[in-house]
Amino acid sequence: MDTMLKSNPQTQQRSNHNGQETSLWSSSFGMKMEAITPFLGKYRPFMGRCCQTCTPKSWESLFHRSIMDLGFCNVILVKEENTRFRGWLVRRLCYFLWSLEQHIPTSFDASQKIMENTGVQNLLSGRVPGAAGEGQAPELVKKEVQRILGHIQTTPRPFLLRLFSWALLWFLNRLFLNVQLHKGQMKMVQKAVQEGSPLVFLSTHKSLLDGFLLPFVLFSQGLGVVRVALDSRTCSPALRALLRKLGGLFLPPEVNLSLDNSEGILARAVVRATVEELLTSGQPLLIFLEEPPGSPGPRLSALGQAWLGVVIQAVQAGIISDATLVPVAIAYDLVPDAPCNMNHDLAPLGLWTGALAVFRRLCNCWGCNRRVCVRVHLAQPFSLQEYTINARSCWDSRQTLEHLLQPIVLGECSVVPDTEKEQEWTPPTGLLLALKEEDQLLVRRLSRHVLSASVASSAVMSTAIMATLLLLKHQKGVVLSQLLGEFSWLTEETLLRGFDVGFSGQLRCLAQHTLSLLRAHVVLLRVHQGDLVVVPRPGPGLTHLARLSMELLPTFLSEAVGACAVRGLLAGRVPPEGPWELQGIELLSQNELYRQILLLLHLLPQDLLLPQPCQSSYCYCQEVLDRLIQCGLLVAEETPGSRPACDTGRQHLSAKLLWKPSGDFTDSESDDFEEPGGRCFRLSQQSRCPDFFLFLCRLLSPILKAFAQAATFLHLGQLPDSEVAYSEKLFQFLQACAQEEGIFECADPNLAISAVWTFKDLGVLQEMPSPTGPQLHLSPTFATRDNQDKLEQFIRQFICS
């Protein structure tokens, strides 16, 4: 499946003439999804180039255009040709023989090297003030170090690794249709290995299966045993013991003790020594930058930032000269272990519970063609040392959301400050707090930078495109022939924006595959003309489709922000229900557009936008405006008396440079620019624009409507209360509104939590101590009904009903 889907006009009409086909569900598709001509002649974009601003040398050194044409491979497809043997018996035992032939480096003296680490030796000798070794017998401290080390890791067992690889390969072939990996991306990683720096893979986290699948993919490509930093909260003690023998790493609970606690100092020193030994020996390390799936809370993982901070500390201390960071993204048609109830934390997975879950999955997959496809993406590696040097020069001053947005919401000010927003929802761990404040900031911005790159380079799967169409355009149903045409259109729009898709095949077969995966959330009805009608199931099914459609949001995020900003600009001029021609009459100045875009950028959470720290808001506003012009929604309008935009002959040369650094706002109104805010735009009157504009606005509707309903919820007077209890009450309110209004895509606990945290940053809610713990209170500023209405009105201006 290494090319695009093929759009054949005859397939869109075949549903009217194929009387023998009784149901889409009963028709098989799996064996027909073959590599064919690229979709509409478009090439497949090569995703994942590293940041040219922060890492220009890495951007040039580890990439060559020839690797773009290497194509894809199915990692779990192991045949007789993948072994050194031939014959009918080999064809039946190829999985087992393949696992025996994999090279597994062994190191039995790792524990001894960790004990000989300088930091550990200082603890054993009592030379660290306040540590556990001060005033204690060295033997007692040594036993404590060995106990902590046993909690972190054990030496991987080669026999167990081979046995597990064979079992996992067998299981993955029954669970997935394929696991695709670009050969060119793998070649970049292999080239980075030859440079000698240890590899650190920084990945998104979509499923609990990621911790097994990604190490297997890297192991199968000859990168050796990848050590995986796992979350001890998701595993029982028995499962943790097994995973350590397979290369897993776990943080001891003592690392989160206070900075002056002796046990905490000892645990953090052992963790640093362990990571230093892994990096020095050249073992690859895999860190997940997102929180485990299903856990409510911030998107960026506190655990991932802690491990990344230890890696940065090792490089800065000179333990290793450099480390090579590789952003990783993984995409599923459907996440295999997606929890049905997202409102509660997942219980730790036990050894027998996991085995039972695997057995149930195998039973469900037996004789079933509804297997999902997986796409693993390895972005361009880059140097940590180079990023550290260049990134510090991009840092600028930032302000809280309360200072940036609250005066504008209340109507006390109309000017948006020219500073960036400071918003950090991920709580710091003990390992991160032990670093200097400057290094803590480096870890946070690097993790956000890498996660942004990983999400942007992730392939868009067919289920995300189908769910987006059904949710945003056809909640009341659509005939299959029309749905096929719009699926083809949205796929092309995705490719034109430089994003890749994780599927290929005949269009009709692909639709059968996608709808069969979504059969729990859609209904198929046959009409008398012979066509089929696809209808989304109301209720929780729409919430599930909304979660799937969020995978498509990064592709259209800039245009969606711009469309909602235009909607907010027109809200006070034209009635929302007014005709498109009436809205197209209004002139929109560039300064007004910039202001509205900035307001929306400040309102939306950074966990959703994932802006790159090296990019200023000014540059993002310009990018949004450019995207709106490129997609045809905005057209330039020449005001009377102004010089035409195409007339470059009469431009006067200035003695000063006509450019400025991306973070410099001091010269935004300079006279050196003839008409900085004089450019005006109008909405395009093309026939396709109204539908596309509405489509873009609806991409951000779930979170904006959740915020607006959270503002309405303030009227009910549910405060003071704890943050957890208040978030739960808000989620129940969103569910009640969903039942009344049919807006089920807003009934998501994560949206409720985002609304509460945004309102805290905005100064609407305040957290105060109490005997029972911290309590949320309504701030005095928003205690009046008038200011609450202003907040709700400010949010609703961006919503297109």
Curated annotation (Swiss-Prot):
Residue intervals annotated with topology Mitochondrial intermembrane: 333-449
Keyword annotations: Acyltransferase, Lipid biosynthesis, Lipid metabolism, Membrane, Mitochondrion, Mitochondrion outer membrane, Phospholipid biosynthesis, Phospholipid metabolism, Phosphoprotein, Transferase, Transmembrane, Transmembrane helix
Membrane topology per record: Multi-pass membrane protein
Regions of this protein lying in the Cytoplasmic compartment: 1-305, 473-801
Region (Acyltransferase): 180-290
Main EC class the enzyme belongs to: transferase
Keyword Hydrolase found: no
Tissue specificity comment: Highly expressed in the testis. Expressed at lower levels in the heart, liver, kidney, spleen and adipose cells. Only detected in primary spermatocytes.
Activity regulation annotation text: Inhibited by N-ethylmaleimide (NEM).
Modified residues (Phosphoserine): S662, S668, S670
Top-rank taxon: Eukaryota
Enzyme Commission number, as recorded: 2.3.1.15, 2.3.1.51
Cellular component GO terms held in the UniProt record: mitochondrial outer membrane; mitochondrion
Chain positions with Phosphothreonine modification: T666
Catalytic activity: sn-glycerol 3-phosphate + an acyl-CoA = a 1-acyl-sn-glycero-3-phosphate + CoA; a 1-acyl-sn-glycero-3-phosphate + an acyl-CoA = a 1,2-diacyl-sn-glycero-3-phosphate + CoA; 1-(9Z-octadecenoyl)-sn-glycero-3-phosphate + (9Z)-octadecenoyl-CoA = 1,2-di-(9Z-octadecenoyl)-sn-glycero-3-phosphate + CoA; 1-(9Z-octadecenoyl)-sn-glycero-3-phosphate + (5Z,8Z,11Z,14Z)-eicosatetraenoyl-CoA = 1-(9Z)-octadecenoyl-2-(5Z,8Z,11Z,14Z)-eicosatetraenoyl-sn-glycero-3-phosphate + CoA
Motif (HXXXXD motif): 205-210
The keyword Transmembrane helix is annotated on this UniProt entry: yes
GO process terms (BP): CDP-diacylglycerol biosynthetic process; glycerol-3-phosphate metabolic process; phosphatidic acid biosynthetic process; piRNA processing; triglyceride biosynthetic process
Main location per the UniProt record: mitochondrion
InterPro entries associated with the record: GPAT/DHAPAT, GPAT/DHAPAT_C, GPAT/DHAPAT_LPLAT, Plipid/glycerol_acylTrfase
Domain notes: The HXXXXD motif is essential for acyltransferase activity and may constitute the binding site for the phosphate moiety of the glycerol-3-phosphate.
Family from the record: Belongs to the GPAT/DAPAT family.
Functional note: Transfers an acyl-group from acyl-ACP to the sn-1 position of glycerol-3-phosphate producing a lysophosphatidic acid (LPA), an essential step for the triacylglycerol (TAG) and glycerophospholipids. In vitro also transfers an acyl-group from acyl-ACP to the LPA producing a phosphatidic acid (PA). Prefers arachidonoyl-CoA as the acyl donor. Required for primary processing step during piRNA biosynthesis. Molecular mechanisms by which it promotes piRNA biosynthesis are unclear and do not involve its acyltransferase activity.
Subunit annotation: Interacts with PIWIL2.
Protein name per Swiss-Prot or TrEMBL: Glycerol-3-phosphate acyltransferase 2, mitochondrial
Organism field: Mus musculus (Mouse)
